[in-house]
Regions:
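N-terminal "leader" segments that precede or initiate the main folded domain
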Residues: 1-86, 182-190, 194-209, 405-412, ...
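Hydrophobic alpha-helical transmembrane segments
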Residues: 4-12, 65-74, 131-136, 338, ...
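Membrane-interfacial loop-to-transmembrane alpha-helix junctions, especially the N-terminal start
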Residues: 22-35, 91-103, 149-158, 367-380, ...
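Juxtamembrane membrane-interface segments at transmembrane alpha-helix termini
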Residues: 40-47, 139-141, 167-171, 189-198, ...
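Membrane-embedded catalytic interface detector for glycan/lipid assembly enzymes
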Residues: 53, 60, 67-225
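Hydrophobic alpha-helical segments
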Residues: 120, 328-444
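Long extracytoplasmic/lumenal interhelical loops at the membrane interface
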Residues: 122, 283-347
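Aromatic-rich transmembrane-lumenal/periplasmic boundary elements in polytopic membrane proteins
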Residues: 203-309
Length: 444
């Protein structure tokens, strides 16, 4: 188990080193691999360090081994994308500040202003994935502020980043969605940190802070959700969240509650190991590509195919493959590691992560090159589908359907940015016509 954990960690830092060589990246592969390790590594580490204090070590060992294989293959896929593709990346002059604010305001409008439309068939998926454009604006704004050592602007963009996870906690009672968004936005800083070691230290510190916040949240999760889901006033909801501060503590493997939190919610390895064991014993059968076929079908909008036989959610798959009775009040994702394995075994694991690494690496590379050129229309179209793919705890159906919806949203935002720039240019030309530049005056 220890060796598998080391392989996972080394894979992350090899990927970081690789992406920092030419810095032609927005950090999206880092965001994916970091998100994958977040739901596998803490639980495996807790089992490795505490020995027999936690049950199911044999399942965890299998799960983290498969995760390590997936990490290596994912990094190889990203490397393959960088080795075979070289989009033009000549630096161009563009109004990056205006674009960042356009993305931020537009994204918030989608997320909060158009949220009632999320229930509409197909339209809801486009609005949900298209709203992620606020992450792009925050990412670029925060990078510029940090690069310029402008503390005031960094604080402003940091506050903008905090809006989404805070509201997700207050309105939905969930921490995971906000944490995923924060990871996507902050990953760009690992690429543009002044030194490699500074990026490594930053990842380590952020991981410790994140796990500390998680275990404190987990201790109070039931109270928070009871308040939020019970329709309590906003003041009471804030009070249930700030109540964490009364018993706030640093994450510790000597704390049984912390161990339980890491084992229960940040340990997909148990599910992977259970599924692998049941497959080996013949208690369940391999899916033989059925969920991959479902993923292809999910790309077709339900507005076109109302009776489409696929739907989001993978709790039933997890229950069937592991034999567990799962709590219906909690979301259970099959995860990329388990789903790739339960389809084709180890070959599915290798091929799945190679392909996913290449796809995210390709989109990230093209997005970064477009940003460097000042081609924001291409940047949007590449960024949104890449973010939709960063869902290591989701199913192939959710990922492929989300990426397709994000691509449609990307083309919509591409058009919107083009229209906004055209109107801005027309307004500038109109002002110039009304107040022409005076010519040279007579010599004095």
């Amino acid at each position: 188990m220890t060796f598998s954990i080391l392989v996972c960690v080394v894979s992350l830092f090899v990927l970081l080193w690789m992406l920092r060589r030419d810095r032609l990246s927005l950090g999206l592969p880092i965001a994916y691999l970091g998100s994958l390790l977040l739901i596998h590594l803490p639980g495996a580490f807790a089992h490795a360090v505490t020995g027999e204090r936690l049950q199911g070590n044999e399942y965890v060992a299998t799960g983290i081994l498969f995760t390590a294989i997936g990490c290596v293959c994912f990094v190889a896929g990203v490397w393959l994308a960088h080795a075979t593709l070289r989009p033009p990346a000549t630096p161009g002059i563009a109004d990056r500040r205006a674009f960042a604010y356009f993305c931020l305001v537009g994204g918030w409008t989608f997320v909060y202003g158009l949220s009632p439309l999320n229930r509409l068939t197909s339209v809801g998926a486009v609005i949900e994935t298209g709203g992620a454009i606020w992450m792009l604006g925050t990412m670029l704004g925060l990078r510029a502020a940090v690069h310029a050592n402008n503390l005031q602007r960094a604080v402003i963009w940091g506050a903008a980043l905090a809006v989404y996870p805070t509201l997700m906690l207050l309105i939905g009672g969930f921490l995971s969605y906000g944490a995923a968004a924060v990871m996507v936005v902050l990953s760009i800083l690992t690429i543009y940190a002044r030194t490699y070691m500074r990026a490594v230290v930053g990842i380590a510190v952020a991981s410790f802070i994140g796990l500390t916040f998680f275990v404190n949240y987990f201790d109070h999760r039931d109270d928070i959700r009871q308040s939020v889901w019970g329709g309590a006033s906003m003041g009471d909801r804030v009070g249930s969240i700030t109540g964490m501060l009364d018993e706030f503590h640093l994450v510790s493997l000597d704390n049984d509650k912390d161990l339980t939190a890491l084992d229960v919610r940040l340990n997909q390895n148990t599910f992977v190991g259970l599924a692998a064991s049941r497959l080996d014993q013949g208690q369940v059968d391999f899916l033989n590509g059925q969920s991959v076929i479902d993923g292809v079908i999910s790309v077709i909008p339900r507005a076109i195919w109302p009776d489409k036989p696929t739907s989001a959610g993978s709790g039933q798959t997890v229950a069937e493959m592991t034999g567990l009775q799962l709590n219906t009040d909690t979301s259970w994702g099959v995860g990329n590691v388990m789903e790739f394995y339960i389809n084709f075994g180890i070959p599915g694991l290798v091929g799945g992560f190679l392909g996913l690494g290449w796809l995210i690496g390709m989109l990230d590379l093209r997005a970064a090159a477009a940003e460097r050129r000042g081609d924001f229309r291409t940047l949007i179209v590449c960024f949104l589908p890449a973010v939709a793919l960063i869902d290591p705890n989701g199913s192939i159906v959710e990922i492929s359907g989300g990426a397709a919806a994000a691509l449609m949203a990307g083309f919509g935002w591409r058009w919107g940015w083009g229209m906004w720039k055209s109107r801005e240019l027309a307004a500038a030309q109109n002002r110039a016509a009304r107040f022409p530049q005076p010519g040279p005056g007579p010599a004095i």
